[in-house]
Amino acid sequence: MDIIEDLKWRGSIKQTTDESGLANLLKHKKISLYVGVDPTAKSIHIGNLIPLTILKRFQNAGHRPVIVVGGGTGMIGDPSGKASERKLLPKDVFDENVSRITKQMTRLFGKDGFEIVNNYDWLSKLDLISFLRDYGKLFSINVMLKRDVVASRLQAGISFTEFTYQILQAIDFYTLFKEKAVQLQVGGADQYGNISSGVELIHKLVGPDTEAFGLTVPLLLKSDGTKFGKSAGGAIWLDPEFLSPYEFYQFFYNQTDADVVKLLKIFTFLNREEIEELADKVKNEPEKREAQRRLAEEVTKFVHGQTAVEEAGKISRILFNGDVENLTASQVAVAFSGVPTIEVADQKTDVVELLVKDKVIEKSRRQAREDLKNGAITINGEKISNVNGVIDPTEKFDGRFIIIRRGKKKYFLAKVQ
């Protein structure tokens, strides 16, 4: 199966500017291709990972990926998918974001076999007169107004700055084609108009038969119709500073049976036979969650590395078995970062007072005593039934945490101050 057919089987293609032309090109040569990354945040998120995964598939097949960090276009603001004008960030903020995202890309693609460039390097040198003479004359206002990204904003209003964004992105593609022989741009579903502008610019400046193509990925929806890529805590970031590898792992492990096979196709590098085998397990042995475990392992390995997979798996097994006393302090900090949390003093404390602190765990002393007597309270892995018991916060986890469980699954964390 060639790479285009594989991407179609995986459901990873929304549109192409010329599918047959692209397929024919790929049969005869290895190409360079690119994805643009917007540095308006310190980290990319799981939605950005879909086109990057396509780039990785091309890299694995011997093609050469190029990542364009939008240090220039990001300062202008992409109107795609936005209902209102973006707030422009200071250049020093962009510079920091560009640096962080560059490191994230290196983790995904390795140190060799790909290239990262910043479009600020060429866009910043483009003066207004050259912009208007060399490029502006090649773009029809009528066509630009019909692009979805512009048409959807005409009612609410769009600035000239954002209106010209598609020209700047087109200049990116032309520059990369001319200087680095890039022949394919990959982007999100909302980027099709911008990508088409780039292909058209190359055809006008180089020739109508020039082999330059665009490919977009679909908007990924869950089986319930909601947009994939959000959790209760917000975006699923790829930077471990904003979302721990364990939480990242858990996000994928917690996907439903209805969604997991689709996600295996889009986000993993497992082959068709392996995915179909996992699909059979979802159908015949869903309680084992083998497909979810494999999905979590594969995507976490791609983003954070094998060591992170092993650590996440270890924490998951310990929590599943209820053996929290075997966790290290650093593992506790990661595994319980999202549970209800209280702060306690660095001194021995009455167990009932601990349970009613800030009314987070128990609402009353009566309820706390009742749960203790009924064996419903576990502290640091040990069941506590003595209503007069005393807890020493220095005994476990380097004196930093106390883990409280009420019932079978409800966890709380006390941070020792």
Swiss-Prot record:
GO CC field: cytosol
Catalytically driven reaction(s): tRNA(Tyr) + L-tyrosine + ATP = L-tyrosyl-tRNA(Tyr) + AMP + diphosphate + H(+)
Binding, L-tyrosine: Y34, Y165, Q169
Motif interval(s): 'KMSKS' region: 227-231
Motif 'HIGH' region in this chain: 39-48
Pfam annotation, one family: SYY_C-terminal
Enzyme class: ligase
SUPFAM superfamilies: Alpha-L RNA-binding motif (SSF55174), Nucleotidylyl transferase (SSF52374)
Protein name: Tyrosine--tRNA ligase
Species: Oenococcus oeni (strain ATCC BAA-331 / PSU-1)
Encoding gene, per UniProt annotation: tyrS
